[in-house]
Amino acid sequence: DVGRTASPHVWAIGDVASWRHPVGHQVRVEHWSNVADQARAMVPAMLGKDVPATVTVPYFWSDQYDVKIQCLGEPEATDTVHVVEDDGRKFLAFYERDGVVAGVVGGGMPGKVMKVRNKIAAGAPIADVLG
């Protein structure tokens, strides 16, 4: 099903494509970095090879003057938010859902945000990032 459409001769990746996330829901990520992740999964499928379920962690960033704002995962309004750093200009917040890390949002802390990607993909307990 990786990249498949209703037509057997058409495959889709990128902004226009909605893919089934391994936990069961459809997800459409509108960011160019997602295309590389999707291509790594889709090309073997196009060649007829078995493709294991892959977890793509949605990611985007925006440079606002001299502060890079980043988001990893799928934070939702109903998540528990743990603000672990905030000096009025730079900040780091983890989003918890059902005891696991659902996302991270940071401003001016690119290294700390990116370190959480594998934790989100693995469904790690929130304690792993709050420790």
Locations of regions flagged by a protein language model:
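Mid-to-C-terminal Rossmann-like scaffold of FAD/NAD(P)H-dependent oxidoreductases
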Residues: 16-111
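A short, polar/charged loop-to-alpha-helix boundary motif
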Residues: 109-126
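Short acidic, gly/pro-rich beta-turn/loop elements at beta-sheet edges
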Residues: 7, 79, 114-116
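A short, charged
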Residues: 127-131
